[in-house]
Amino acid sequence: MTRRSIYFLPLALMALLGVGASADDDNRPLRIRNAPEFDGVTRWINSKPLTMKALKGKVVVVHFWTNGCFNCVNNYEHYRAWQERYADKDVVIIGIHSPETASEHDIARIEKQAEKHKLKFPIAVDNETRNWEAWKNKVWPTVYVVDRRGVVRYGWEGELNFKGQKGEETVRKVIDSLLAETTAKGTR
């Protein structure tokens, strides 16, 4: 076997198995199947404590963010729009604030950020990052869409519309699709 073959063989195997990224990837960071329970939440803002079990039967949009992340701030308008658009539907928007730095553990600062940017949806303060770890999250911001059975069906890493990407539109279509899917099956 030549040196060239040693390098080529693993790449060929990956191609055969469909492993790797392609230009058609639509940003699906799914590392889990079932949505984990909210665990170790330091405090809930804008809501009483929520559980994934109690949210079964609803489409749940979970987004991870932190105060010091400008990409997270750029996503706020989309979260607010979804909150308004789906207010009369079985959709729940939940923010999970998982800090990156020591200063981001400050609950008063998180509340101030939520008030300043009119974030009215439930926010779980994840100061111990137990939810971050349970969801196997990697970057801020990340958005997950969970179906009515509690199965994570879609995920988007990073700013939704960064450099012309269509993340907001894609996530919205996933939400609409899940609402139509469950309505068509009569499982509202």
Each predicted region: which residue ranges?
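N-terminal "domain-start" segment that seeds a small globular fold
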Residues: 23-52
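Bacterial N-terminal signal peptides that target proteins for export
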Residues: 1-9
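Structural micro-motif
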Residues: 118-122, 136-144
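Structural microenvironment flanking redox-active thiols in thiol-disulfide oxidoreductases
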Residues: 73-117, 127-134
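Short active-site neighborhood of thiol/selenol oxidoreductases, capturing the structured segment around
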Residues: 50-73, 93
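Thiol-/selenol-based redox modules, centered on thioredoxin-like
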Residues: 145-188
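Bacterial N-terminal signal peptides
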Residues: 9-18
